Amino acid sequence: MGDCRPLGFLIGLPFALVALVLALVGAVIWIIGTVLSCLCPCCFCFAALANFAVDLIKLPIKVLRWFTHSIPC
């Protein structure tokens, strides 16, 4: 039953690499958003930007999990 899980990992790998690039972009956005929210705490949009960046950082793991669980066994 567990032999198809590596197949899902291999199929999802190119998408995970794209998600990894987005995660790096998210890390940069998170750093910029955190600095800007410290400079101007009255702007709530910077906090929302930082939360969006954290979601981008978690994206590669979510993509791999989705592909691994999508392969029927």
From Swiss-Prot:
GO terms for cellular component: extracellular space. Residues 1-27 form the signal peptide. The keyword Nucleotidyltransferase does not apply. Disruption phenotype: No visible phenotype. Its main location: secreted. InterPro entries: TAXIMIN_1/2. Confined to the vasculature of various organs, including seedling roots, leaves, cotyledons, sepals and petals. Also accumulates in root hair cells. It is found in: Secreted. Keywords: Developmental protein, Secreted, Signal. Signaling peptide involved in the regulation of lateral organs separation. PANTHER family: SIGNALING PEPTIDE TAXIMIN 2. This is Signaling peptide TAXIMIN 2. The lineage of its organism: Eukaryota, Viridiplantae, Streptophyta, Embryophyta, Tracheophyta.
